[in-house]
Amino acid sequence: MCHTSCSSGCQAACVPSSCQPSCSTSSPCHTSCFTSSLCQPTCSTSSTCQATCVPVSYRPAVCLPVTYKPTLCVTPSCQSSVFLPVSYRPAVYVAPSCQSSGCYQPSCPTLVYRPISCSTSSCF
């Protein structure tokens, strides 16, 4: 049910094809929470968001369980630790102190969702 499309030039750490959500063009999953436009899910007018296809740490916040859903997912507000655990936050909003302490490897792309297990050899 899931499909993917990474635009030309997309960063290597795009969500694997087996784990990207499908969504309709009217779905909030289309633009809400992927911070890199190159790695947004493909949309089809005949499909709906398949949140279960994507591990929680990679899902747009609109598809996350309520427990992990921030009110504003791609604004500077996400820098606040009250919204999401660091492993579920877009890397671009992870506090610099966390990045420097090893929560994220700096060699991995910074504008994609990724878990704290991200490493230099395998971002996903």
Swiss-Prot record:
Record-stated family: Belongs to the KRTAP type 12 family.
Family matches, as InterPro entries: KAP (IPR002494)
UniProt keyword annotations, A-Z: Keratin, Repeat
Binding partners and assembly: Interacts with hair keratins.
Sequence repeats: 10-13, 14-18, 19-23, 24-28, 33-38, 39-43, 44-48, 49-52, 53-57, 58-62, 63-67, 68-72, 73-77, 78-82, 83-87, 88-92, 98-102, 103-107, 108-112, 113-117
One GO term describing the cellular component: keratin filament
Gene name tied to this protein: KRTAP12-2
Region (20 X 5 AA approximate repeats): 10-117
Function text: In the hair cortex, hair keratin intermediate filaments are embedded in an interfilamentous matrix, consisting of hair keratin-associated proteins (KRTAP), which are essential for the formation of a rigid and resistant hair shaft through their extensive disulfide bond cross-linking with abundant cysteine residues of hair keratins. The matrix proteins include the high-sulfur and high-glycine-tyrosine keratins.
Entry's transmembrane regions: none
Name of the protein in question: Keratin-associated protein 12-2
